[in-house]
Amino acid sequence: MNGKSFLDSSSTKILQDLAVAPIDLTSPGIISKERIERFSLFVEGFTFSYAMERVDDGILSALTGLASERGLLASMKAMQNGEVVNYIDNFPSESRPALHTATRAWVRGISLTGNAEDISLRSKIEVQRLRDFLNKYRDAFTTIVQIGIGGSELGPKALHCALKGCCPSDKKVYFVSNVDPDNAAEVLQEIDCSKTLVVTVSKSGTTLETAVNEELFADHFLKQGLSFRDHFIAVTCEGSPMDDTTRYLEVFHIWDSIGGRFSSTSMVGGVVLGFAYGFDAFIQLLEGAAAMDLVALEPHMSENLPMLSAMLGIWNRNFLRYPTTAVIPYSMGLEYFPAHLQQCGMESNGKSVAQTGELIGFSTSPILWGELGTNSQHSFFQALHQGSDIVPVEFIGFLRNQRGRDIEISGSSSSQKLFANMIAQSIALAKGRENVNPNKNFKGNRPSSLLVSERLTPYTMGALLAFYEHKIVFQGFCWGINSFDQEGVTLGKDLANQVLRIMQGQQGGDNVVIEAEALLGLFDKNKKLKEFGEA
């Protein structure tokens, strides 16, 4: 990563000047067939169209220059080769590599060295152990419940949803994440415990929400006369309190160098996906992700899909100053994907301190959000078209549906109607529509991109997952921040434990005692807090 500040880069100054009068997408003839063909990229079964972004050749050249100045490619190579990228200079930090790409590098025989080679070999061993476990136990259970929170739930849940439409399965899958006991109670009402496998996922083995939910499940199983060890397995770091094969039926491993939000291609996602859809489906997902890892190493930005998309996002965020980005998938299989991206993007790049340890004076991660199309067209798209804030949109679509069932009505199939809506929204946002009635006038110039593949499969889902991982990481490299820690999450955990001690009549800690006691007193006028949650 370049030691110079993002703001001090010469390309930044060029882009600031260009942003004063960016291309007007509403001008007649601007969005031409030639522009649409030139501003597109074909890679790993995806077509990426950025003709509806407010960029031209000059802006793209300056963005390429900025990516070069900020050392994006070198930083990506360093990350994938296992160099330490999770650090803050001159201050205590995690100071370790970020090796999520190593969890899938082995499936394509990607050559690695040092830490990356070690984690790749270990990942291959864990996958082989998973294969053996599935061969032995998969037929013994009809249901799997994954207990975990954050990256131990959001990514695997998004992938499960993506695969269930294309991979036949007779298995039932549930996720329990929230410490709200109603989350666990709802699942327990649905399952036959005697035929259920529970996988508890926690890197540290001490995650509060996960430990509480596991205990709740264990108590329920015990009351039904079922052995904990016969039904519970774990995914955790070696040496954690959960790394205990005398307690669990099996323990699979993950490593500190793999962040939770980037862990879906490790055993964090592998166990539940392998159980639900079979070992081969998980391998295909790994192959797609590994293929996109190689794309992220392409030297030219025009051929490097994650880098190109990352720099378009930098343009929208830092130069056109758009505060949020919407991700709108036109596929039921991606129902939970925006929630995963929200964590991946905002937990990674929601930072205001540079890796140098200095405060930064520019915007970092936009607010990431989204919902399925066409549903979202009938909820918040009004604001996208005519709201006071311009929101760049990233559309994701597929030419064919997953399940193969469709019907033709009025000359077109449902899949064609879905795809037509996505294309129409992109055009409408860019071009707008003039009307003398101001309430019916659409100004346009609202940027978007289109990412399209033929069909959502395990392979394309793996590639899509890795595409967004690398896009987010490239942006962190460009901003000069550490995309791999999450001190804000740690702070909340620490203070919650202090508040709990106060609720239990113990010393809570100087950080929160006055505020917590006042707030707890406000909510405790009629009922003792220790009775909360009881019938």
UniProtKB/Swiss-Prot annotation:
Similarity remark: Belongs to the GPI family.
Cystines in this chain: none
Active-site residue numbers: E347 (proton donor), H378, K493
Main localization of the protein described in the UniProt heading: cytoplasm
Keyword Repressor: no
UniProt name for this protein: Glucose-6-phosphate isomerase
InterPro entries: G6P_Isomerase, G6P_Isomerase_C, Phosphoglucose_isomerase_CS, SIS_dom_sf, SIS_PGI_1, SIS_PGI_2
HAMAP family the record matches: G6P_isomerase
One GO CC term on file: cytosol
Location relative to the cell: Cytoplasm
Enzyme Commission number(s) from the entry: 5.3.1.9
An example Gene Ontology molecular-function term: monosaccharide binding
Gene3D superfamilies noted in UniProt: 1.10.1390.10, Glucose-6-phosphate isomerase like protein, domain 1 (3.40.50.10490)
Keyword line: Cytoplasm, Gluconeogenesis, Glycolysis, Isomerase
One GO-annotated biological process of the protein: gluconeogenesis
Pathway: Carbohydrate biosynthesis; gluconeogenesis; Carbohydrate degradation; glycolysis; D-glyceraldehyde 3-phosphate and glycerone phosphate from D-glucose: step 2/4
Organism, scientific name: Chlamydia felis (strain Fe/C-56)
Enzymatic reactions: alpha-D-glucose 6-phosphate = beta-D-fructose 6-phosphate
Pfam family, one: PGI
Function, as annotated: Catalyzes the reversible isomerization of glucose-6-phosphate to fructose-6-phosphate.
